[in-house]
C-alpha cells in the first residue's frame, strides 16, 4: 500500500499521487464510506489508474459514480471500461449523453482528420444526467453541479466548499480548452462561464489539465478579454460573433471608396 496524498481534505489528484503526468487530471473525491472519480482519462492508462486506486487501499466496489466533466476522449475514452470494472454509475450533462452513448468520434475529439488523429471511442451508457443546481452526495462530501458551457456544450464544473473543479474552462497559464465549432464550442457561452468563475468566491481552481492553482481574477479577466477579441475575428470562423472588417468594407463600397494605401 502507498500513502494517500491528499491535496485538500477528501481530494486526491491522481497525477500528483502518481508523481507523473497522465493524459488528464483525475480527481478522487473521498467521502469516507465511498468515493467518486471526476473523469478517468484514456483507455490505455486506465489499468494504471485502477491499480493506483487499489494501492491507496480504496476498494474498487466503493466507487459510487464517475462524473464526466464533458465528453472529450482524453477525459472519457476509458469511461465504458471503468464503469464495467468499478460497477458504478456514470453521470454526465444531458448534452454529453449522445456523444458518449454513440461513441461520436468527432464530437469527442477522438478523430481529427486534419491532424491524422484517430483513436477508438467506446460507447458508454450514461446512467444519470446531471445539470446546473444538482447536488451530489459522496459519503460525507457534497458537490454542487455547475453548467459551464463554452469549450463544449456539455462542460460541467463541480463546487465543493472553497474548491471548484473547473474542467477545461481555464488553466494556470490563462489558456482555455480548445475552441472549435465542429466540436460544439461557443465563444459567447465560454466568456459567460469564465465570468461566473471570476465572480465566484471559490479559492482554488482544480482544472482538468495542469496544476491546481489559486483563483486569480486578473488572470481570468485577461483571458476573458482575449476571448472577447476572438468574437470579432475571422480566425475563429463560425465561433465568431461578427467580423468588423466586412462592415467597414461594406461602408467603403457604398461610398465608392477604394483605399489601396
Question: Where do the language-model regions lie?
Answer:
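Short Pro/Gly-enriched beta-strand edge/turn motifs at strand-loop
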Residues: 7-14, 113-118, 140
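Short, charged, surface-exposed secondary-structure boundary motifs
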Residues: 23, 100-103, 174-175
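Divalent metal-coordination and catalytic microenvironments
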Residues: 29, 39, 49, 70, ...
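C-terminal regulatory/interaction regions
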Residues: 236-261
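Active-site HxH/HxHxD metal-binding segment of metal-dependent hydrolases
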Residues: 42-46, 54-135, 225, 232
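Metallo-beta-lactamase
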Residues: 35, 42-44, 135, 142-149, ...
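Conserved beta-strand hairpin/beta-sheet module of binuclear metal-dependent hydrolase folds
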Residues: 2-56, 157-167
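A structural micro-motif
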Residues: 9, 88-89, 203
